[in-house]
Regions:
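Glycoside hydrolase catalytic-domain context in secreted enzymes
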Residues: 1-80, 88-98, 103, 125-562
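Short beta-strand elements
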Residues: 105-127
Length: 562
């Protein structure tokens, strides 16, 4: 392992590592670079082994060598101080940078010294390219939990790992717990300074006119001015496995399909070939392979007329029983995030937007739609649970996110402004749409709350009053407009619009559905005609024949004049 080199202008750090195949057969190997940061007892919590970056060799024949250059950003050495600075901090001291065969076994080690502590807390000194300063957003998610600390050589181990003594939420957290039953849109607007947006304008633009334009291009305002409130509600509410056509602006009905390792259309039953699981892709440590995975998804999406892919998924493997472990990559956020970023880049190079999911802290399937609350602290969130998503957005360039069913502390993840606005959009600079996980209400999902707090599209397959924004004041309509912008921006930059404005068409399954529905209606009408005819025939047969010169008396009996 060479000495560490640093580009002070960009913050890029690197080391050269030579790998030699000393075995008897050809094979590949992985170079993993870790750091062991300086730790002060009782100070910022730090792990002694943190994966910074990795690379994989080519196929090496016996006796063959290859020198790999492994790079990472200096900011990756920083830790998040959620207690005092409430920001990322790169503490002064010696950082042990090592090449390892795994997180435990050191092969070679160098020292990198930071002379002065650096706190990333000003607009001209943000962490890892953040657009704004990263600061505490999730204090309420900490809950009534004792977290394990390294202080005193893990002196609180017994307390932190003891069984809970109470299964009741504190009154303070109960007071903050938000669901549909206690959500008040009017109260949410109390301090709003929003003005009513223009709607229904006749500017003559179609969505294809904006393909490839920046998110903030002035033409977007002109296009959005053309939408009516009804059209915007249609757009955000019918997001089950695609987004609907809006003919007035040339918006196609596009298909988005599920499958972490394939593409599966729930309506047509058509699926692509299956690819290896996320766990297998992560285990290869092969970025090129992950990119090829995304490329294959993109190619098959074209064959299936698909625009969006409900994957990759990148929550953390915390324990063996998590219900979605098969979809998630790793217990390490850098490994997971790096592989995810390559899959996204591969798919999006083919014009297919990948929904990075389930954002965030999705950890179990049991009770997943029963207001399941996940509790953690800010440092763990930023350094572990959000980190792979951050890499997927910043390095992978993700344009779509699927939020999670669970709560983060007392707030639903799919309507959490700290997560979806402050961190995702403001800090990381995400541009695109946020889709809910399956939308069926569950007592806490409603479109009004979701769109006001950073969500955009409801993964709904049936019409429900809660899937539209019903409080149509200035703030409500502004939220609809923002959500519409995010959806339309993502779709306009998909392969469906790569050649400009296409003809507004429908999917084959929609026509099939209409034909089946029409046939059913005609069959019912035919049965109704048959039933009416039979009824009239029976009624005619039941009429009493009255002979000439007969009359009916008041009692209804028949009399005949002699």
């Amino acid at each position: 392992m060479s000495d560490i080199s640093v580009d002070e202008a960009t913050g890029t750090m690197s080391a050269d590592v030579t790998v030699t195949n000393t075995g008897q057969v050809a094979g590949k190997d992985i170079v993993q670079i870790y750091d062991n940061p300086p730790y002060t007892d009782g100070g910022i919590e730090k792990a002694s082994a943190n994966l910074l970056s990795y690379e994989k060799t080519k196929l090496l024949e016996p006796g063959e060598s290859e020198t790999l250059t492994v790079t990472w950003n200096r900011d990756s050495l920083a830790s998040y101080d959620a207690v005092n600075a409430k920001a990322y901090v790169l503490e002064a001291g010696d950082y042990k940078i090592s090449a390892r065969s795994n997180s435990h076994d050191v092969i070679d080690e160098k020292t990198y010294t930071v002379d002065v502590t650096q706190t990333f807390n000003t607009a001209d000194n943000t962490h890892d390219g953040d657009k704004v300063v990263a600061t505490n957003q999730f204090d309420d998610a900490k809950g009534d939990v004792t977290y394990l600390s390294r202080a005193g050589r893990f002196a609180n181990l017994a307390e932190a790992t003891a069984a809970p003594t109470s299964f009741e939420m504190s009154e303070a957290n109960k007071a903050k717990f938000l669901a549909t039953s206690n959500y008040d849109a009017a109260a949410a607007d109390a301090d709003s300074s929003a003005t009513m947006p223009t709607t229904g304008a006749k500017n003559g633009l179609v969505l294809g006119d904006l393909a490839g334009l920046d998110y903030d291009d002035p033409k977007w305002d002109q296009l959005l001015d053309q939408l009516t409130v009804k059209e915007m509600n249609t757009l955000i509410s019918k997001g089950g496995y695609g987004s609907p056509a809006i003919s007035s602006i040339g918006k196609l009905r596009v298909s988005d399909v599920d499958g972490p390792a394939s593409l599966n259309n729930n309506f047509t039953g058509v699926g692509s070939i299956g690819l290896p699981s996320a766990v297998s892709v992560a285990a290869t440590f092969n970025k090129e392979l992950a990119h090829s995975f995304g490329d294959a998804i993109g190619t098959m999406a074209h064959d299936m007329q698909v625009s969006g892919w409900y994957a990759p998924a990148t929550n953390t493997h915390r324990y063996a029983y998590a219900g979605r472990n098969f979809e998630y990559f790793s217990e390490d956020p850098v490994l997971a995030g790096s592989q995810v970023a390559e899959e996204i880049k591969g798919a999006q190079a083919k014009g297919v937007y990948a929904f990075l999911k389930h954002f965030a802290l999705n950890d179990q399937e049991t009770n997943r739609t029963h207001m399941l609350a996940t509790w953690t602290n800010e440092q763990a969130m930023r350094e572990i649970y959000l980190r792979s998503f951050e890499i997927g957005v910043k390095d992978g360039g993700a344009h779509a996110i699927m939020s999670a069913f669970n709560y983060i502390g007392p707030e639903y993840a799919g309507a959490n402004p700290a997560l979806l606005k402050n961190v995702l959009r403001d800090e990381w600079g995400f541009r695109g749409m946020v889709l809910t996980d399956y939308f069926a209400g569950y007592g806490y999902q409603n479109a009004d709350q979701i769109t006001r707090n950073g969500g955009d599209l409801m993964l709904a397959t049936i019409d429900m009053p809660i899937s539209t924004v019903n409080v149509q004041d200035a703030a409500g309509v502004s939220s609809l407009r923002r959500a519409s912008h995010n959806i339309l921006y993502t779709v306009a930059n998909s392969w469906m619009y790569e050649n400009g404005q296409p003809e507004v068409t429908r999917n084959a399954w929609e026509y099939i559905t209409w034909v089946v529905a029409a046939a059913a209606i005609l069959a019912l009408l035919g049965l109704e005609v048959v039933a009416i005819r039979r009824y009239r025939t029976r009624k005619a047969e039941a009429v009493i024949t009255v002979e000439p010169n007969a009359s009916i008396d008041e009692a209804g009996s028949e009399t005949v004049e002699e």
